[in-house]
Amino acid sequence: MRPFTKHTGLAAPLDLANVDTDMIIPKQFLKSIKRTGFGKNLFDELRYEDEGQPDQECDGRPLRKDFVLNQDRYKGASVLLARQNFGCGSSREHAPWALDDYGFRSIIAPSFADIFYNNCFKNGLLPIVLQAEEVDQLFAEVALREGAQVIVDLENQTVSSPSGATFEFNVDNFRKHCLLNGLDDIGLTLQQDAAIRRYEEKRMNDAPWLFLPRGQ
């Protein structure tokens, strides 16, 4: 998992409340258990005029020109501004996979659905909860200037707007540690590699019959 320390990126404003996980990545794309390849179908029903299908190429599909990610000024956005209750609905982990695969590093909203919020941290995305009026200010500033960037500083737990206004956010210390160091569940387990080896060696000494080849 990529570490997240400080990120400066183009912000895209998704001005919709209660965006659920089926809107983020529709159900027909959930067959794969690989974490990659979902970006082209992120917000599929909002981005495209037609209904997308698994393994379908998206280059020739008709776009909804009014959707934020289809507008030239927001191409390459890596910070998503959202409204309240983002990520509600089913608990599909494919939702943060799709956001990450598209290129987003952080999502800023007044509130998130709990399971989606937790899944973001496990997949290297930083979900940030700010006050509604602070999110409103970010939306307003991003709309005013093309190419407006937002600075997300995890170490200092601040978000800086395009005008330089700074907003503080809270994050659990353990989750912060994991993101700063790029540690997912596997990475955390590997940190205990020496202790795991010692345990296995002790088990082999205490109960060697458990480790005999089958049939012996």
UniProtKB/Swiss-Prot annotation:
Which UniProt keywords are present, listed alphabetically?
Answer: Amino-acid biosynthesis, Branched-chain amino acid biosynthesis, Leucine biosynthesis, Lyase
- UniProt name for this protein: 3-isopropylmalate dehydratase small subunit
State the protein's purpose: Catalyzes the isomerization between 2-isopropylmalate and 3-isopropylmalate, via the formation of 2-isopropylmaleate.
Subunit composition and interactions: Heterodimer of LeuC and LeuD.
Record family assignment? Belongs to the LeuD family. LeuD type 1 subfamily.
Query: What is a GO molecular function of this protein?
Result: 3-isopropylmalate dehydratase activity
Source species, domain of life? Bacteria
Q: In which pathway does it act?
A: Amino-acid biosynthesis; L-leucine biosynthesis; L-leucine from 3-methyl-2-oxobutanoate: step 2/4
Question: One Pfam family from the UniProt entry?
Answer: Aconitase_C
Entry EC number(s): 4.2.1.33
Gene Ontology terms: cellular component:
3-isopropylmalate dehydratase complex
Biological process per Gene Ontology, one example term? L-leucine biosynthetic process
Q: What reaction does this catalyse?
A: (2R,3S)-3-isopropylmalate = (2S)-2-isopropylmalate
Q: Which InterPro entries match?
A: 3-IsopropMal_deHydase_ssu (IPR004431), Aconitase/3IPM_dehydase_swvl (IPR015928), AconitaseA/IPMdHydase_ssu_swvl (IPR000573), IPMI_Swivel (IPR033940), LeuD (IPR050075)
Q: What class of enzyme is it?
A: lyase
SUPFAM superfamilies in the record: LeuD/IlvD-like (SSF52016)
